[in-house]
Structure formats: C-alpha cells, structure tokens
Amino acid sequence: MIRIGHGFDVHKFGGVGPLTIGGEKIDYPQGFLAHSDGDVAIHALCDAILGALAMGDIGKHFPDTASEYENIDSRILLRHVVSLAKEQGYVLGNGDVTIVAQAPKMLPHIQAMRSNLASDLNCELSQINVKATTTEKLGFEGRKEGISSHAVVIMNKESMSKTNA
C-alpha cells in the first residue's frame, strides 16, 4: 500500500542565530523562536510522515509543554518518526520539501540538507528533494519575520518497496 502525507511548519525569527534548517546550521543574525531548534523543514517532514500513516502530528508526539524536547535537535525527532513508520511497516518512497524564505538564501545549503535528511530517513539521496522559494517580498516571509516549509511524502509498505527496488 502507498500512503501520501503533507506537512507544514512555520517559525518566527527571534533571538540570535544561527538557524537550523534541514539539519544544517545556517549563519544568520537571528534564530527561531521555538521550543525545539525550530527546524521548519524537518518539522514539516515529520508531520508529512505522521500524516501519511494517520499517526497524528508532531505536536502529539513531541508536545511543546514537555521539557525533554526543549532545544532538542530536530534530527532526533525525525529519526524517531522514521522508527515509528518502520514499526508500522512503512519506509519512505520519496519526499519533497519546500522552504519558503526571503532570507537567508538557501541554495548554498540545499545539498547538505538533502544529505542530512537522507541519512536520517535511511534512504538514498535521490529519494529526498529540498528546494526553496521566496514570496516576492509578500507576507511574513517576505518581510523577513520568519520562515515556513511544506513537505510531501510517499510512504511505501516495506515489502512493496523491496519488490520494486
């Protein structure tokens, strides 16, 4: 069986940088206001995986009221979500992440983000895409108040993924 999921996340800028996006530290004067490290790309990806498997959302699994998740590296959260999917017999077919940001520029960091995500997802680099866009200076992203991210995933039943490999 194939399952499709979509995720979305947004965080406002605040405090001091760097930013962490896609598991990559990006030099920027501001950081994110968030309970965890605020990695919008990974949070959207976690939500997409959880949504595909009808397992709720990131807030259900990692509530912002729980002190153990304060300032946590979101890659740890992603690896946990991947293990939950594996317990249900699912693996990533492919994933596509879109980062919406006026600044900083993402292009210099995209390949490192893809490598980080592929490692945490236990998949080939060709199974995960990361891209970035601006809002042409419109909205909160355009005013450089924060960053948002969307993610879409296809999750395959593990036995299906082995026969198609």
From Swiss-Prot:
Residue positions binding a divalent metal cation: 9, 11, 43
Catalytic activity: 4-CDP-2-C-methyl-D-erythritol 2-phosphate = 2-C-methyl-D-erythritol 2,4-cyclic diphosphate + CMP
First-tier enzyme category under EC: lyase
Family annotation (Pfam families): YgbB (PF02542)
SUPFAM superfamilies: IpsF-like
Disulfide-bond pairs as recorded: none
EC number from the UniProt entry: 4.6.1.12
Co-factor: note: Binds 1 divalent metal cation per subunit.
Any one biological process term the GO annotation gives: terpenoid biosynthetic process
GO molecular function, one term: 2-C-methyl-D-erythritol 2,4-cyclodiphosphate synthase activity
The protein's annotated pathway: Isoprenoid biosynthesis; isopentenyl diphosphate biosynthesis via DXP pathway; isopentenyl diphosphate from 1-deoxy-D-xylulose 5-phosphate: step 4/6
Positions marked as site (Transition state stabilizer): 35, 134
Amino acids binding 4-CDP-2-C-methyl-D-erythritol 2-phosphate: 9-11, 35-36, 57-59, 101-107, 133-136, 140, 143
Keywords: Isoprene biosynthesis, Lyase, Metal-binding
Cofactor: a divalent metal cation
Family: Belongs to the IspF family.
Record's function text: Involved in the biosynthesis of isopentenyl diphosphate (IPP) and dimethylallyl diphosphate (DMAPP), two major building blocks of isoprenoid compounds. Catalyzes the conversion of 4-diphosphocytidyl-2-C-methyl-D-erythritol 2-phosphate (CDP-ME2P) to 2-C-methyl-D-erythritol 2,4-cyclodiphosphate (ME-CPP) with a corresponding release of cytidine 5-monophosphate (CMP).
NCBIfam families for the chain: ispF
Quaternary context: Homotrimer.
Protein name stated in the entry: 2-C-methyl-D-erythritol 2,4-cyclodiphosphate synthase
Gene: ispF
